[in-house]
């Protein structure tokens, strides 16, 4: 087994590849981490009032600081994602773009991710991203 590099968006269980994620999502239970949920819900939430001329830099910084180092994509891999012709081609699809907007703006992102991972177009997009980020991982399915 490889060291897990990713976490399930629903239950935060670590997984190492697309194949492992597919196996996991069949039996995923978002309530597998109730203690962590209770702790997080007990913590005070930070509210940020929108300010004019304020970029998304703060929210990006919060996001980057929110997860463990192992969950982050390297700058080189981000660059590779941006330069991928296949990924750019997929992102021209208006349906995929709408799914991405809905996911970005949605309240329950884990629920949306579970639903979208049933959509072949979104799975193709996710597989493409993972293939770029983890080029050494060959699909086992």
UniProtKB/Swiss-Prot annotation:
GO terms for molecular function: zinc ion binding. The keyword Zinc-finger applies. One of its GO terms (biological process) is maturation of LSU-rRNA from tricistronic rRNA transcript (SSU-rRNA, 5.8S rRNA, LSU-rRNA). Thyroid receptor interacting proteins (TRIPs) specifically interact with the ligand binding domain of the thyroid receptor (TR). Requires the presence of thyroid hormone for its interaction. Interacts with NUFIP1. Interacts (via HIT-type zinc finger) with the RUVBL1/RUVBL2 complex in the presence of ADP. It comes from the Eukaryota. It comes from Pan troglodytes. Zn(2+) binds at residues 8, 11, 24, 28. InterPro entries: BCD1, Znf_HIT, ZNHIT3_C. Keywords: Cytoplasm, Metal-binding, Nucleus, Phosphoprotein, Zinc, Zinc-finger. This is Zinc finger HIT domain-containing protein 3. A zinc finger (HIT-type) spans 1-28.
